[in-house]
Design a protein with these regions (language model features):
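N-terminal beta-alpha lobe that positions the nucleotide/phosphoryl donor
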Residues: 1-142
Length: 142
């Protein structure tokens, strides 16, 4: 018996539409979140399920980690795709997804943390043989 596959798209607009189309091509069901201001966006009509996560202010909706996790629980999804911006580069959110039993569809929280530290990231890239732009490699004093 095939396991049902379902993801939550935690973004809006063209980012959500592109992710939704790709997920559908891969055979996934899709739940999408939205703020009250975004209730008529196209990706919601294309989704299998749409869940309101808060008011228009993105700090209270698309950046509300608890609301996104609750929506994922409500929709009974396997993973959460943050898209771009909002929570996509938030290492703590990626870890919360994992700890809540959801696959964070993106880099691991460890990689997000590492790449957020530009000195450590540049050192790692050098170790891996990736060309880096020459320049100062230490912390900048203010």
């Amino acid at each position: 018996m095939n396991k049902r596959k379902k993801i939550l798209i935690a973004n809006r607009g063209v980012i959500a539409i592109r992710a939704l189309r790709a997920a559908k091509e891969l055979g996934y069901e899709v739940a999408s979140v939205y703020s009250t201001a975004d209730r008529n966006l196209k990706h919601l009509k294309l989704s299998d399920e749409a869940i309101c996560i808060g008011p228009p202010d993105s700090r209270e909706s698309y950046l509300n980690e608890a609301a996104i996790i609750s929506a994922a629980e409500l929709a009974n999804v396997d993973g959460i795709y943050p898209g771009y911006g909002f929570l996509a580069e938030n290492a703590e959110f990626a870890e919360k997804c994992k700890n809540s039993g959801f696959k964070f569809i993106g880099p691991s929280h460890e990689i997000i943390s590492l790449m957020g530290d530009k000195i450590r990231a540049k050192d790692l890239m050098r170790q891996l043989g990736v060309p880096v732009v020459p320049g100062y490699d230490g912390p900048v004093d203010r």
